[in-house]
Swiss-Prot record:
Record EC number: 1.2.4.2
GO annotation, biological process: glycolytic process; tricarboxylic acid cycle
Known partners and oligomeric status: Homodimer. Part of the 2-oxoglutarate dehydrogenase (OGDH) complex composed of E1 (2-oxoglutarate dehydrogenase), E2 (dihydrolipoamide succinyltransferase) and E3 (dihydrolipoamide dehydrogenase); the complex contains multiple copies of the three enzymatic components (E1, E2 and E3).
Taxonomy of the source species: Bacteria, Bacillati, Bacillota, Bacilli, Bacillales
Described purpose of this protein according to its UniProt entry: E1 component of the 2-oxoglutarate dehydrogenase (OGDH) complex which catalyzes the decarboxylation of 2-oxoglutarate, the first step in the conversion of 2-oxoglutarate to succinyl-CoA and CO(2).
Name recorded for this polypeptide: 2-oxoglutarate dehydrogenase E1 component
Amino acid sequence: MTRKNTTTNPWAKFHGPNLGYVIEQYDLYVTGAGSVDPELQELFEIFGAPSFQDDVVTGDNTATHFSPQNTGNIEKILKVVQLVEQIRSFGHTLAHINPMEDAANGQSLLEKAMNELSDADLKAIPAKTVWPDAPEGIHTALDVIHRLKEVYTQSLAYEFSHIQDSEERAWLHQMVESNSLRQPLSNKKRTALLKRLTAVEGFEQFLHKTFVGQKRFSIEGVDMLVPVLDEIVLEGAKNGVEDVMIGMAHRGRLSVLAHVLEKPYSHMFAEFKHAKIEGAVANSGWTGDVKYHLGREQVVSNEEVSTRVTLANNPSHLEFVNPVVEGFARAAQENRKKSGLPEQDTSKSFVILVHGDAAFPGQGIVSETLNLSRLNAYQTGGTIHVIANNAVGFTTDSYDSRSTKYSSDLAKGFDIPIVHVNADDPEACLAAANLAIQYRMLFKKDFLIDLIGYRRYGHNEMDDPAVTQPQVYKKIKNHPTVRAIYADQLQAAGVLNADEIETITQFTQEQLKSDYAQVPPADTSDATIHVKVPDVVAKGIQPIDTGVELDSLRAINEGLLSWPEGFNVYPKVKKILERRKDALEENGKIEWALAESLAFASILQEGTPIRLTGQDSQRGTFAHRHIVLHDTDTNETYSPLHRLPNINASFSVHNSPLSEAAVVGYEYGYNVFAPETLVMWEAQYGDFSNTAQALFDQYVSAGRAKWGQKSGLVLLLPHGYEGQGPEHSSARPERFLQLAAENNWTVANLTSAAQYFHILRRQASILGTEAVRPLVLMTPKSLLRHPLTLSTASQLSEGRFQPALEQENLGTKPNKVKRLVLSTGKMAIDLAAEIESDKHEYNLDEIHIVRIEQLYPFPAEKVQSIIKRFKNLEEIIWVQEEPRNMGAWHYMAPILFELAGDKVKTGYIGRPDRSSPSGGDPFAHKAEQELIVSHALDVKYNFRQDKLEIEVFSN
């Protein structure tokens, strides 16, 4: 028998979705159609059917009594609950978020559910039954539906259903469903907003009329981007943020520079006129860049707060600035002045990334960068993304540029809340901006605003968009600007009258004309094809003594080989480390990894922080580094470099995600914003670094020449031909050498642990100086433990990095030397190994070998001095393991011709031209390599008399 207790009502605590669940469970309980939750089954047995008795107050203040004791009412409640959730989840399909469309096209998703309930049904259900947090004045379910449709289907549309954290999802719904998000703006703020829109529109139209045909990539159609950025920056400053980093492409960039970053109009106009104007700050390198790629740094303030805003320099390679700016932010957030890991404070800075609607889903770098957002080594406490959505990519319509409904859909996979907003509704746009910054500051996670507008002109101002989008541009031609729309709204609301609005417009025009009048005539007197590189750059890195006292090295080594008591090091790793114990003693040998650790420790002791990342950088791809140890029992980690004495600089080494482009961009950005830090990126294999080629081309190699943006980033690229096939042999040094010019970076391929030690210390010594430049290192694989690459303690404690090294025990009879062999990296070691073996029958008196350790800048003076010693020299040969069309040959050939003069032949020995870097057969590789070595060491292997004829090894 069912027992009833009428004194209590356990159902009162169930509302909304929970109520729907209880009703479904009771239906199963009554019909026996399925299993019922045991706790609810007990309640049903004790209390019977769920009772939600309440008085429903209707709009005419009459009260009706409602009790869902019968099945019909239960079903209606369930349908209302489902409808409420559908509005929250799919209301965006009904929203008017596209100013170029009259109505939303998603009616069918909700109309069925809405048609199943009459107004009378809805009026009979208390609001609190289906919406526990219903605000004051919402009495019935009909009120609930009207209110939620007003929230979710107007010019703001929300996508929160994909958010996995229930607390975050509840907070987001509460924010948009309460009145807190869209509080009416004061008349003062509404007037200020109109003034801002008038300035943006006036600036763009002034450029359009004054500099006819010049590219400016107008913001018009998404003008609200500027006030949105204003709002985010201001609210960030109110929250104590010290640095706001902005990354964006060229669309709207000039207006953002002029308004958000307060670049004077006169300076902008001077760039269009190619005029010199007093007070303009040079923001470019010696070759420069177009005006819509340039960045700026500015302290932005109002009467209450201030913050520093940095707009990053940017190429036209869309979205590749994203990880760079994330690196800026992480560098700004971290305190690197203590030993151990840096101390991060994500409240100190945050990132705003402005995306294009075609580029956001189209460029893979976007996904790579989003993937960094929750990773310990890369997270920055949340980025605010703004898609400046003009619904077209150059001439490509959205249906040809993405496979998703919205351009923002990619963000759903990364648990990012999304707000779509009509760019013709200024106050809705500001509400979206406020929600974004509040969410970021509270939850320390990313947020996305899809600012949907249009593009008033073509991709650039010389392009006619009506050729490819004729129907849309008929609409756009007759569509009022957002400034005009908002001005009409303020006039209708009595905030401003027509004369006051006209006064605002005239003030903007007078300001533009006044600033233009300050710009002198064009001045092309300094236009020249001869670009002057700064002297400190042109001179290259001067010799620097980088040795470390032997006692200091021994003390460091002792610290590197110690760990906390009770810490259980993996036995195999322990043996590797213990072998290093006597490496600095007499007759000891230092291998590559130990030389690196000693360099790191000595650099840290001199006050330089270090950051190293890569896919396997803690252990090392080749199980050589072991700079982070793992306890075999607890999996806790320990790095000896965190506990060494006399260190006041941080050390961080992180395993990166399986990404090259985003990580290289991030580390480059980190280094730019933390110039005192030795920042290093290590490829798993150098072969894979080419997926970051755009970063090497646009930023690392050219950033200083274009923008004056200095970097000391170190690239560690494992390289060497060992019969492992075309994906595990070549870091493609030819590409880095092709980009080498104007002393833009150092490219090296080393042959000893000591050389690695010294070049790292040299790189650390130039950080933060005008001499700084990136360092590209072809690092070893099989050579990591090769006997011929090992070094002695004295080679670390004395001297400096040597750009060129002579092979020991050769060239001792200068008058007999006929052939000078130049080589680098593993190829040089293969030659040395053959020389030291007892198998050869070469006449070594007639040959000398020079290892070119630093390929760029080439050590010409050093090599020339060596050549002069050999009066009977007949030929200079470049020997490499790469195919002739790869490696350093095409870079070296003109250098050799100049070094050789008229009397000495030059030549090449190596693999022939090939389309693939390496073959896949290890036996064929070995045979080829042996033949290259034998031809290089056999002086009888003759070359043609004409020095321009290159002898090529072939099978």
